[in-house]
Amino acid sequence: MSNHKLIEAVTKSQLRTDLPTFRPGDTVRVHVRIVEGTRERIQVFEGVVIKRHGGGISETFTVRKISSGVGVERTFPLHTPKIEKIEVKRRGKVRRAKLYYLRNLRGKAARIKEIR
């Protein structure tokens, strides 16, 4: 077996199949497992997906939310076991793959139309 086939087989076994399909513009709730010392808890991060990057085992997505008037962005690896689950709250209608322009918009201007 060649190296490429071996790497492909190993990464294919590591991919998660239990995650929903979502795209940039969707509002999602990401349930992340946080380890603090010996304790473990679930933290929920809810916001708009502004980008998806990469493919395969190294695919990531970035979620943006406004917390206390400050924009917070967090990038998650898609296939990490630290993600407990992802809930899609709203489907957004956008015409771009990367929604970086949302960083400059405030309030109602930063809203995204919902797909019916």
Curated annotation (Swiss-Prot):
Keyword Ribosomal protein among UniProt keywords: yes
Keyword check for Hydrolase: no
Gene Ontology terms, MF aspect: structural constituent of ribosome
Listed InterPro entries: Ribosomal_bL19, Ribosomal_bL19_CS, Ribosomal_bL19_sf, Translation_prot_SH3-like_sf
Annotated Pfam families: Ribosomal_L19 (PF01245)
Biological process annotations from GO: translation
Alphabetized PANTHER family for the sequence: LARGE RIBOSOMAL SUBUNIT PROTEIN BL19M (PTHR15680:SF9), RIBOSOMAL PROTEIN L19 (PTHR15680)
Protein name per Swiss-Prot or TrEMBL: Large ribosomal subunit protein bL19
Originating organism: Staphylococcus carnosus (strain TM300)
